[in-house]
């Protein structure tokens, strides 16, 4: 049996679209937003509104998900050839909450460890990534909202095939490995983000690699070759819209407005961090991550109140540095 494929959510549709508004032209964004695949019934409508988090006091929060589809066929985007979710067939191996503040000054990316030991509605306690396997997008969103008390405004999902396509679409990425910068194509970058056993902190370092990759994709997109060449820009947007699926509440008009409002955000304005962790443990024979509830609540409160800039300035966080590893 082949090793379990670990998938990075390269979910850069929003970020890359923002970067391309100024370079490729608004016409391209307007044209391609209509091609984005929509996921029907992504939200937990079975949960009464009174039991769901209140809207944030400013900005919007997205849940970005990378899934291990265990399929040789693409499962997300308009080119999908297999279902995006079947019971027990997929796990969300990468989950990031992305908060875009009301002042459009930054983007805050918070990774949720896939092995976080959490309450999953209707299933008791289990690893966070099991929620998608058992109940698809609605159960995962419900679980994340109950964990954080943060309203998830929108969802974006990409699978393994989409990850590789996205990397190759931007012309590959530059990542630092053992002190040397290497240029990687989609297949090579997948190996980079899958690595765990040979990293000092295992899954925690792999999470940083996932964040490094996302930043590298955005940086690569900013190259003159991608931004000033209409053909290259069109090819890139075509690949993005073919690979990524979003919830059906995110209309074409919403997406265009979102991209326009955040058009000045650049890779250097993105703040990457991890949800605070108390420790690792073994529960029911499984290696799990126990989140630090007190420290996590301060982070989630800042996200709810749209005050993440103040939070980052006053808290020591497990943040991604300026280099790569």
List PLM regions with ranges.
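Amphipathic, coiled-coil-like alpha-helical scaffolding segments used for oligomerization/assembly
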Residues: 128-181, 249
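N-terminal hydrophobic targeting segments that direct proteins to the cell envelope
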Residues: 3-90
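Flexible, polar/acidic helix-loop-strand segments at domain edges
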Residues: 60, 162-239, 244, 324-325
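Second-shell loop/turn segments in exported
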Residues: 83-86, 126-134, 149-154, 197-205, ...
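Sec-exported extracytoplasmic/periplasmic mature domains
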Residues: 99-102, 117, 133, 145-149, ...
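C-terminal solvent-exposed extensions
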Residues: 72-73, 77, 184, 245-325
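N-terminal post-signal-peptidase region of extra-cytosolic proteins
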Residues: 43-51, 74-96, 130-145, 151-152, ...
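Extracytoplasmic
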Residues: 57-60, 90-95, 104-112, 123-125, ...
């Amino acid at each position: 049996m082949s090793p379990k494929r670990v998938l990075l959510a390269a979910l850069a549709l929003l970020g890359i679209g923002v970067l391309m508004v100024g370079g490729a032209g608004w016409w391209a964004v307007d044209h391609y937003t209509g091609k984005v695949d929509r996921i029907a019934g992504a939200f937990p409508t079975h949960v009464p509104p009174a039991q769901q988090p209140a809207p944030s006091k400013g900005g919007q929060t997205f849940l970005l998900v990378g899934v291990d589809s265990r399929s040789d066929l693409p499962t997300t985007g308009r080119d999908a050839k297999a279902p995006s979710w079947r019971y027990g067939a997929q796990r969300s191996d990468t989950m990031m909450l992305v908060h875009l503040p009301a002042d459009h000054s930054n983007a805050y990316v918070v990774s949720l460890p896939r092995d976080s030991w959490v309450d999953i509605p209707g299933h008791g306690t289990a690893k966070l990534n099991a929620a998608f396997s058992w109940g698809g997008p609605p159960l995962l969103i419900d679980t994340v909202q109950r964990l954080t008390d943060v309203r998830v405004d929108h969802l974006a999902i990409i699978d393994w095939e989409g990850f590789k396509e996205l990397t190759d679409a931007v012309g590959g990425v530059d990542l630092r490995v053992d002190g040397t910068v290497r240029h990687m194509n989609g297949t090579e970058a997948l190996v980079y983000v899958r690595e765990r056993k040979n990293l000092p902190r295992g899954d925690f370092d792999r999470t940083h690699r996932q964040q490094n990759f996302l930043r590298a994709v955005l940086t690569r997109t900013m190259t003159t070759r991608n931004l000033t060449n209409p053909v290259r820009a069109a090819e890139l947007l075509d690949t993005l819209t073919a690979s990524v699926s979003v919830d059906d509440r995110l209309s074409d008009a919403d997406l265009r407005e979102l991209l326009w409002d955040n058009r000045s955000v650049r890779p250097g304005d993105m703040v990457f961090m991890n949800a605070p962790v108390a420790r690792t443990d073994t529960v029911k024979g499984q290696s799990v991550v126990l989140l630090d509830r007190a420290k996590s609540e301060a982070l989630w409160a800042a996200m709810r109140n749209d005050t993440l800039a103040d939070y980052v300035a006053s808290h020591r966080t497990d943040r991604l540095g300026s280099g790569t590893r």
